[in-house]
Amino acid sequence: MGDFNLALVIVAIVVCVIVFISSIYLLVNYQHPDDANQAYFPKFVVVFGLSIAMISILMLPADVANRHACRHAIYNGACNLTLPMKDLWLAIYIVDAILVFFVIPFAMFFYEGDQDKTLGKRIKSALIWVVTTAVVCALVLGILYGVIGKVDFSVRHLASATSTFPTSWQFSNTQPCIGNTARQCSAFTANPTSEKTWTMRTTFPEYVVALATIVGSVLFTIFGGVGIACLPLGLITAFIRRPKAVITRSQYIKEATELGKKARELKKAADGLHQEERSGAKGRKWRKNVKAVEKELLQLEEDVNLLEEMYPQGEQAETAWAFTVLGYLAKFILGIVGLIVSIAWVAHIIIYLLVDPPLSPFLNEVFIKLDDVWGLLGTAAFAFFCFYLLLAVIAGAMMLGLKLVFITIHPMKWGATLMNSFLFNVGLILLCSISVIQFCATAFGYYAQATAAQEIFGHTLQSLRGIKYLYKYNVFQIGFVILAGLTFLYYIAFGWRRKKTSGRFQLSS
């Protein structure tokens, strides 16, 4: 099996290189033209953060493959050339936490700093915010680790009577080694009072990962629960509300005139808000108005794109309309596939996690059977389900960002994504990726058993003092399913309706 172990190491290195190249590809194709040939530090953070996020998701399938690298699934320490998965997990998530709480905020403060200031002043301003955050986080982590940084494992004290060795070593049916009356170990019938609590202090890296997981789990429950429903249903409703035919030139001119008027109103409002920002009047009303302008701007861009789809121009107008029709058809197909995956996810959570004892291994058994068909087929399906949860988080964040005032909108658009939106979404992905891994390690516990991820997330995290009850009573899983159900009902009731064009835009006074 040594050759297989070496192959696993080589595959891991190749995958890391592919992930790094993919991150650069996403940055180059999604970045805004205004950020071309500048903002190199934020771009480095984006590429590095995306790579860490994708690698962390792929590490769980790698952990499962690593477990099988030894003959008869012997634990990894019993053979050579396997990956040190526990050390890799801790390293990845410590880097993850540093990026989320320190590096990405610094890059965002630096990027969004006043361009009229010198480079030194922008760095100084960003450092002040980050150092303040670092001091607060260090104090909170230190106090919590010192006071409640322990794990409480429930164990059962077992005791059994012993039998004396026989004086004669001539065994037969009438003279066995153990007497006929010794049918079971007496500890098997131990009473409930024999249960004890074994307390020990966890390591600091594991504690940091645990707290980061809690923060990520809250966001994952909210955004993921909403996104698991709105991701496929959003694609399906886009197909339902698609333009059915090309409009006339007069209709196009009328709609374009209205959109131009709306654009001038938004520009005037944005200029006014910029003047207020310069004067230091950044109160609650200012933030509310900024949110309103962002929302209207996104709606305006969506209306412009829709108008261009309904009235294609140029020599290839017919071809453009054909691609528009095919694009909406692709959205419908992807929406149906996504809906099947979302239903499978929610059903698996209910069947395997919320019902005690589980009704069925469900997706665990599917992955195992796929592995029997071809070695990496189950692993690939496993990775796909994990990645789908991350996509659901992004979709949920976008939907809630458009509906709720206190959530900032950071859309990701091909060729039009500013670096602050890139950084925000990378931070969200990194923070939620920890929770996605923990969630998958729990949801697919039967398939991912005896892995390093289960040791960290399945035992230590769920026994950590102060937060173990969140996992004991499935708080996050229940919240996830409830939000998914509410979002589904929302789309059934309102999602199919066409959006009404808003009237004249005005700032709140």
Curated annotation (Swiss-Prot):
Pfam families: LMBR1. Residues 251-316 form a coiled coil. The chain crosses the membrane at residues 8-28, 44-64, 90-110, 128-148, 208-228, 332-352, 382-402, 422-442, 475-495. It is found in: Membrane. Its main location: membrane. Signal peptide: none annotated. It is a multi-pass membrane protein. It comes from the Eukaryota. InterPro entries: LMBR1-like_membr_prot. Belongs to the LIMR family. This is LIMR family protein At3g08930. It comes from Arabidopsis thaliana (Mouse-ear cress). The lineage of its organism: Eukaryota, Viridiplantae, Streptophyta, Embryophyta, Tracheophyta.
